[in-house]
Amino acid sequence: MVHPVQVGKRTRMSFSRLKEVGQMPNLIEVQLDSYDWFLKEGLQEVFDDINPIQDYTGNLNLEFVGYKLDLDSIKYSVEECKERDSTYAAPLKVKVRLLNKETGEIKEQEVFMGDFPLMTEQGTFIINGAERVIVSQLVRSPGVYYDMTVDKTGSKLFSATVIPNRGAWLEYETDSNNIIYVRIDKTRKLPITILARALGYGTDAEIIEFFGEDERLKATIEKDNTKTREEALLEIYKRLRPGEPPTVDSAESLIESLFFDAKRYDLSRVGRYKFNKKLAIHLRITNQIADQDIVNPQTGEILVQKGEKIDKDKAIEIQNCGINEVYIKIDDKSFKVIGNHFVDIHSLVPFDISDLNIKEYVFYPVLKEILDNYADEESIKEEIRKNIYRLIPKHIIREDIYATINYELGLSYDIGYKDDIDHLGNRRLRSVGELLQNQFRIGLSRMERVVKERMTIQDQEVITPQALINIRPVAASIKEFFGSSQLSQFMDQTNPLSELTHKRRLSALGPGGLSRERAGFEVRDVHHSHYGRMCPIETPEGPNIGLINSLATFAKVNEYGFIETPYRRIDPKNKRATNDIVYMTADEEDLYVIARSDEPIDENGYFIDDKVTVRAKEEVLVVPVSEVEYMDISPRQLVSVATAMIPFLENDDASRALMGSNMQRQAVPLLKPQAPIVGTGIEYKAATDSGVLPKAKNAGTVVYVSADEIRVRRDSDGGIDKYKLLKFKRSNQGTCINQRPIVSKGEVVAKETLLADGPSTDLGEIALGKNILMGFITWEGYNYEDAMLISEQLVKEDVFTSIHIEEYEAEARDTKLGPEEITRDIPNVGEEALKDIDERGIIRIGAEVRSGDILVGKVTPKGETELTAEERLLRAIFGEKAREVRDTSLRVPHGEAGIIVDVKIFTRENGDELPPGVNKLVRCYIAQKRKISVGDKMAGRHGNKGVISRVLPEEDMPFLPDGRPLQICLNPLGVPSRMNIGQVLEVHLGLAASKLGWHIATPVFDGAIESDIVDCLRKAGYSEDGKTVLYDGRTGEPFDNRVTVGYMYILKLAHLVDDKIHARSTGPYSLVTQQPLGGKAQFGGQRFGEMEVWALEAYGAAHTLQEILTVKSDDVVGRVKTYEAIVKGENIPEPGVPESFKVLIKELQALCLDVKVLNDDNQEIKLKESVDEDADELEVNIEGTENQPEEKEEKEKEDSDEYDDLREEDVEPDLEELSLDDLDLDDFGDEH
């Protein structure tokens, strides 16, 4: 039944039937926790890996002892960094110790290692003044993966890949002759026995003795032409280092360094964990028949007798007592199973070692050696600490390789299983911390080389750590990562939801990931292991579909980087749903049977039905209650935040829900935000976690509230907390950030209470659009193809008005001819144009500007021309004439207008940091109020998008029986074929709720059903079908049929017509082809392509066609002459030769063809290089204005149209797209 729920300061009527168990985690903890780990542990790991750096003689030893981020000496606050274009960072100080072994002298110093970018509380970084987000990357986890293919004859061929975190890959494959090959580090394949020999099993007999009798092994030995360990080593060396003289010693050291050297080969913690999980012997012997007695080597006790079945517990016991080889019986054959000899340390050490913090399995032979040699608790613990890298090796060991070969052999007997690489148990997340750690490691290893070189060069007596260390490579690699990595993205700040989603994004692209072109369908597909971890709905349309995903609402990332999702434990004894919550990774989840969250249970947690619908791996089954082990915790745990904000998601087709999720992120913040009448209840959580709203840091009482500051007196010590509110700031996307207080003086606030609303929030709930009275009705064809008809009331009352702020900057530089100057004194500019310019030459705040108006007056010195003798004489007599300058003022670009809201001035004198060569920098901010207009794109939350086709006067809109006119008319044909019925249910419920004065929460998969909506309509006094008679506003006659009318939540999207509309008469031309550029940013023309030419040909419009292909495009002389004719009012002259024809001839000549152009009399026509001498004579500048009205390519353009589009690898600039105006010619003086 519908019940009230308190959400922040608002009460919503909720239709949910389920009691939520467990809290949703903080939605940006992916970012915060990861960076936190990096500062606490990640940095230390890198230093540990590189310690100590020794010189080549082994005499000098440099060690990093400890480090600290100096948080007290941060230069600027976050806000100041944004204003000054600087990076929010803290200095990293590292304590370094230098030991000279000959003299025994130790020098310690604290060395500054560069400024380290800090994460803000919102999970972002400020890099050069721009707010950026580091997107988490989904990559294949290191480990060993087995695969199976079936060949032409129908036999199964198995292959395997051993993937480290870094280092050489090992790949096994079987051919149709049953020979097993290995590739080492992607080289040519060798029989696998060569590898086994090289690792220590030299003769055929030893190999068969160790691995057991096997047909494939024998076939491989036959193929193998080496017979001893030495031969095998030389063979491998020849393959890996062709052309070098092979010796046994060099071959041995090569294999050692390839696989068994922690600096060259790193499995990482995850890799070791996955290896031990896959190769553990207990998994492969469970439920098998023993072929020999299995005896505990310590006690001599028989664990399993020959012919007995091994159960799961016995198998684990066998592994943990150090047994690594077990014979089992398969189809009357004996097969030897070999593990990698890792055991659970807790089952072997007789006392508690939880303080050692060892969670992984450890290598048994090393542990046994420690336990055999030491008896007391303290020394055993001490030895374990000392030998931790031998117990848990970071690199692969011989036993691992033997176990992988044995697993490969066992697969043909159905022992073990093949892996699915798209399973989330085999893909992990690399978040900020790890990505940064890898980058830092690269920087440090570059630095290590420098340090070693300096150690050998410098005098060992006077050497200091400071003199050895060069921090440049470290600083450069960090800077490179934040500035240009594909995963470091300009934050999508259109609204709070787009910020939040950007921080929770998971990308499979980027360095070390996939590339768009290579990614097939399997990787992009929805997988059963995504349930509760990755949203199946929210992903971009286009080339990135399925490669960029979003984290599900309840998901967390564990220490290994695997995504976990929570489940309720079902008590195994009485099968009652408990409130214990267990987080599980995808491969753990596969072992259990899991019921859905909306399975009916009574108030004590017992299942009401005898049979229950469950998920088991990829299957959905119906099983008796006794088999259920876990239960989902919430119906919305499988979707992302944006998707969970679509009401009635369960009634929408998936592809439309996808558009709905994506379009909510493009909603522009409106002047007066309004929370949805029909919400889903997650709006408050999303807004509070997005980081755009100020929260109380401590509990207390509000003592002062104004538009831009709130003060709270703390309860704890009576001190005052001040909160500055952001007023009309520009976001990354040019939308407006403005915060408004929602607390009043005297109000008592708890810790974490919201104090103010931000952009697109209303009482702390995300409010992306407006509740609009609409009807599904066609009107005179203005609804055709999803177009929308809107009422003029929406324009008059500023319902969909938004504020947009653009930033423009002018810098005064030093040029060869002298410094540029910012001044009010500009040549050839009348007083009228300077009316809003102050005495400094800068526009005043509050001035209204249109395109072409001066924002900052600036003059640049012109080159002196050669003077004649007479002029020199006059100059000498009358003194220096004023030097020539030209006007290079910053003007409002074409098509822009608005009001100046802020001006910032940075100069060298004030001590501001400016780029070299810049003396003064002025930034102007122009705000525009954009009302809704024809051509703007609007959308609902169900993927129902459209463009406004007409703004109709209020009195002409269809109206209700009570006289209220509709605000929007939508096409009823937009619903049935698209199958997003959620919008219809939303409209009905919205109608009833607005009459009842309710705000509604209808959570996804647990919301209102049809009968609930009918009840609400009845309660509100409307007809049960939600339809009503509508009257035509023009005639007052009723329409023929009753129409569905109600309230729909509608968003205005960031595709505004003002940003797209564009017109050009003349402007810049491309350098080579001399054709006009394309696109609004280049102030380009409209493309007249091949098909358009056909159209004119078909009409026989010969003159129009000739004109378009010549004077309107690339006939350089013709276009000047035409312009002249128009100016002088004469007839248009005949066109000349288009430049592209000359380019074609040049291209043919470049192919060594002698091409001549002949006339009718076979006379050669000389094509002269067309120069604009005619233009100079005319003094007509048709190359656009001298300061080309090119919009300042803003910082955000670097992240192409869709912010999900991770930037392509560096794109070569297309020469044709560069126009002369694009080159910065100021640096070349005035020769041009």
UniProtKB/Swiss-Prot annotation:
GO cellular component assignments: DNA-directed RNA polymerase complex
Family matches, as InterPro entries: DNA-dir_RNA_pol_bsu_ext_1_sf, DNA-dir_RNA_pol_bsu_external_1, DNA-dir_RNA_pol_su2, DNA-dir_RNAP_su2_dom, DNA-dir_RNAP_su2_hyb_sf, RNA_pol_bsu_bac, RNA_pol_bsu_CS, RNA_pol_bsu_protrusion
Species this chain originates from: Clostridium botulinum (strain Kyoto / Type A2)
The name this protein goes by in its record: DNA-directed RNA polymerase subunit beta
Keyword Isomerase: no
PROSITE patterns given in the database record: RNA_POL_BETA
Enzyme class, UniProt record, top EC level: transferase
Compositionally biased spans, kind Basic and acidic residues: 1189-1198
Region Disordered, annotated ranges: 1170-1232
Catalytic activity: RNA(n) + a ribonucleoside 5'-triphosphate = RNA(n+1) + diphosphate
EC number: 2.7.7.6
